[in-house]
């Protein structure tokens, strides 16, 4: 019984204790998961700050660019201009060129015309005629330019102007494989329509397409354009039916479809680029609803259709749009493509465009050697597709990897570099807070991104801005003077050819240290006496010689003038003494004797002319009361002042008619040992 009982206890302990091993594992896994989450948070924080900084710099450079990227050596392909005309340029030709421009005001500009080539109007509910003329297999298209003007104070709504640009017969449900490209109808809209004399009154421009189709409606709802031979067109139609635009004859009905596209929005931005367009048309009902209650809807069999099904079921208008200078040129401008995504495939688009181009155009593109044609067709040249993805590293471990993309845009500043070498060079020079390593890939490239621990993130701006008021420091609009720094960086080294090998990771494993090449321009100096920051324009003057700037002299004089408990003579002596001490830099008690004797030598004649000798003596006595000067210094100063007075004999004769002193007493230079003046009667 004992063994059985023991085994039962063991089994019971297994049954009841089966949780203990799993709880131990969970207790081990839980800290590991928390550690991974903490590491991931540190990874996000490490990449968050530089990304926010570069996003801010991107926005600021869009508003006030510091440099033009097309001027950089590795971005030369962004510069579409050439310097060929500089060799033959002459200053004397400027006047003739300006006069020629004024003499030909109607010369077409680069985008003088908006050309619309209509491929066809597609509608499944309309049956084409089988035994009729070609013009009965078409619909009438009217294009209007809608100008939405700014609302005035008295207007309830924005005034709208509709300018008709033309009417065309557009093929109805054409077969594009059997139709010649040159047979498509075309319409031109001059750019003068978009830039009138009062363009400031127009807020936005739109194109309004209005398609009208006449035919018979069968019981199934389809419209047929078959003509009835028994209809007598000479029969008179009642006036009431004439006013009804939807009825043209017995059983005939007219349907009108409209669509509107914005050319320039309210911010004057172009919305319609060169390309192929397919517009969903909306049918206008026979009984129009009030404009205030009108809504755009697409209804079929009582059910609302998704937007993409509208292009397969509802009526659509296909056309090709391009901006051209020569309306007689049948060639098609390069089609502007949107930003390519990771799944973009341009082969189908290119083949579709080539089917719509005339045959002579391809020959023209291949043999044309003009600069303008090369510029126009360069964006459409087939180039190798590169799939680029970024791999973010933190603590030498891969933390995150982006999806592969086909474009060469910088992820931080969205700059289109157009070439892989230019992208890597831009990332290395413009985003040096990160370290980028290029890793070749069979289908493209992989760029490893890690934090640059050696980056000097100290403040490199104007050091005076730190000590200035916040509102004033960053309110300047133009360049300011910086501290002069002279460094010889490099002396025109031989430029190496662009190669992707310079972006590969170094074999020694040490990351490249991004160091600052220029230093010293953000160094800040201070005045030795006032401890105020020294401005760059004050660097040429020694701060030790700036004890008495003009503003400080004026301030001292103004403060003394505000005293009310002293007379004018005492104010004058105080002004002279304070300016004298400031100019010579006397700051210690033991310098007062020297300051007094120097003051007599410099300002003695002025004191004698203004009869301020008594006031000066009172000033020396005041200094003696504070133990700044001795009686011997007072004796020497007054004796020297007496010698200066005796050296001006003409001064005595000129002063007899004047008041003797500021206090109304004549002054003799005799004094006692206690510094008190003795008045001698004449």
UniProtKB/Swiss-Prot annotation:
Does this entry carry the keyword Nucleotidyltransferase? no
Q: Per the record, where are the segments of Polar residues compositional bias?
A: 340-354
Gene Ontology biological process: chromatin organization
For region VEFS-box, the annotated ranges are 523-599
Q: Can the keyword Zinc be found in this entry's annotation? A: yes
Against Pfam families, the record matches this protein to: VEFS-Box, Zn_SUZ12
Report the function annotation for this chain: Polycomb group (PcG) protein. Component of the prc2/eed-ezh2 complex, which methylates 'Lys-9' and 'Lys-27' of histone H3, leading to transcriptional repression of the affected target gene.
The organism named in the record is Danio rerio (Zebrafish)
Protein name per the record = Polycomb protein suz12-B
Q: What CDD domains does this protein's entry cite?
A: C2_II_SUZ12, VEFS-box_SUZ12, ZnB-Zn_SUZ12
The protein's GO terms of the molecular function aspect are:
chromatin DNA binding; zinc ion binding
Quick one: a GO cellular component term?
A: RSC-type complex
Q: What would be the name of the gene that encodes this protein?
A: suz12b
Family assignment from sequence similarity: Belongs to the VEFS (VRN2-EMF2-FIS2-SU(Z)12) family.
Subcellular location(s): the record lists: Nucleus
Assembly and binders = Component of the prc2/eed-ezh2 complex.
Zinc finger (C2H2-type) residue ranges? 408-431
- Name the UniProt key words of this record, in alphabetical order: Chromatin regulator, Metal-binding, Nucleus, Repressor, Transcription, Transcription regulation, Zinc, Zinc-finger
Chain intervals for the UniProt region annotation (Disordered): 326-355
**Which residues does UniProt assign to the signal peptide?**
none
The main place the protein resides is: nucleus
């Amino acid at each position: 019984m004992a063994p059985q009982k023991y085994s039962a206890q063991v089994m019971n302990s297994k049954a009841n204790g089966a949780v203990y091993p799993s709880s131990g594992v969970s207790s081990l896994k839980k800290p590991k998961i928390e550690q991974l989450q903490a590491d991931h948070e540190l990874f996000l924080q490490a990449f968050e700050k530089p990304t926010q900084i570069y996003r801010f710099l991107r926005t600021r450079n869009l508003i006030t660019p510091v440099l033009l990227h097309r001027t950089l050596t590795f971005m030369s392909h962004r510069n579409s201009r050439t310097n060929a005309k500089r060799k033959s340029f002459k200053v004397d030709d400027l006047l003739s060129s300006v006069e020629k421009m004024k003499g030909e005001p109607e010369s077409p500009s680069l985008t003088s015309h908006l050309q619309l080539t209509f491929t066809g109007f597609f509608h499944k509910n309309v049956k084409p005629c089988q035994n009729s003329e070609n013009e009965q297999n078409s619909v009438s298209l009217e294009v209007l330019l809608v100008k939405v003007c700014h609302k005035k104070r008295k207007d309830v709504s924005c005034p709208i102007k509709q300018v008709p640009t033309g009417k065309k017969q557009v093929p109805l449900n054409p077969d594009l494989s059997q139709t010649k490209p040159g047979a498509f109808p075309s319409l031109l809209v001059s750019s003068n329509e978009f830039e009138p004399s009062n363009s400031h009154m127009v807020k936005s421009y739109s194109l309004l397409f209005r398609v009208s189709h006449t035919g018979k409606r069968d019981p199934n709802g389809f419209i047929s354009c078959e003509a009835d031979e028994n209809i007598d067109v000479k029969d008179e139609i009642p006036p009431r039916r004439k006013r009804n635009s939807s009825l043209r004859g017995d059983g005939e009905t007219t349907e009108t479809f409209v669509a509107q596209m914005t050319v320039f929005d309210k911010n004057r931005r172009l919305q319609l680029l060169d390309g192929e367009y397919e517009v969903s048309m909306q049918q206008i009902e026979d009984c129009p609803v009030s404009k205030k209650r009108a809504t755009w809807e697409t209804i079929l069999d009582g059910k609302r259709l998704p937007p993409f099904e509208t292009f397969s079921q509802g009526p659509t208008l296909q056309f090709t749009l391009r901006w051209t200078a020569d309306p007689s040129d049948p060639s098609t401008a390069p089609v502007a493509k949107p930003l390519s995504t990771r799944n973009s495939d341009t082969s189908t688009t290119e083949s579709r465009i080539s089917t719509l181009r005339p045959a002579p155009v391809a020959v023209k593109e291949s043999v044309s050697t003009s600069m303008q044609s090369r510029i126009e067709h360069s964006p459409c040249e087939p180039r190798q597709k590169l799939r680029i993805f970024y791999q973010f590293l933190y603590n030498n471990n891969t933390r995150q990897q982006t999806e592969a993309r086909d474009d060469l845009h910088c992820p931080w500043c969205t700059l289109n570099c157009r070439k892989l070498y230019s992208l890597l060079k831009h990332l290395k020079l413009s985003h040096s807070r990160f370290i980028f390593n290029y890793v070749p890939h069979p289908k493209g490239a992989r760029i490893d991104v890690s934090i640059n621990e050696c980056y000097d993130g100290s403040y490199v701006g104007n050091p005076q801005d730190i000590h200035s008021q916040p509102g004033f420091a960053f309110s300047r609009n133009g360049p300011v003077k910086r501290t002069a720094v002279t460094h010889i960086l490099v002396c025109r080294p031989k430029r190496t050819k662009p190669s992707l090998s310079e972006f590969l990771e170094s074999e020694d494993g040490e990351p490249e240290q991004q160091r600052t090449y220029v230093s010293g321009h953000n160094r800040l100096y201070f005045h030795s006496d006032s401890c105020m920051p020294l401005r760059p324009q004050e660097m040429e003057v020694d701060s030790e010689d700036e004890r008495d700037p003009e503003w400080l002299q004026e301030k001292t004089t103004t403060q003394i003038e505000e005293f009310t408990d002293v007379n004018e003579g005492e104010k004058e002596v105080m002004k002279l003494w304070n300016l004298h001490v400031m100019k010579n830099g006397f700051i210690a008690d033991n310098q007062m004797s020297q300051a007094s004797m120097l003051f007599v030598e410099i300002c003695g004649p002025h004191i004698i002319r203004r009869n301020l000798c008594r006031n000066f003596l009172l000033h020396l006595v005041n200094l003696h009361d504070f133990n700044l000067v001795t009686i011997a210094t007072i004796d020497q100063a007054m004796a020297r002042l007496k010698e200066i007075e005796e050296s001006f004999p003409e001064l005595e004769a000129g002063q007899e008619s004047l008041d003797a002193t500021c206090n109304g007493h004549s002054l003799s230079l005799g004094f006692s040992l206690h510094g008190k003046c003795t008045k001698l009667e004449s």
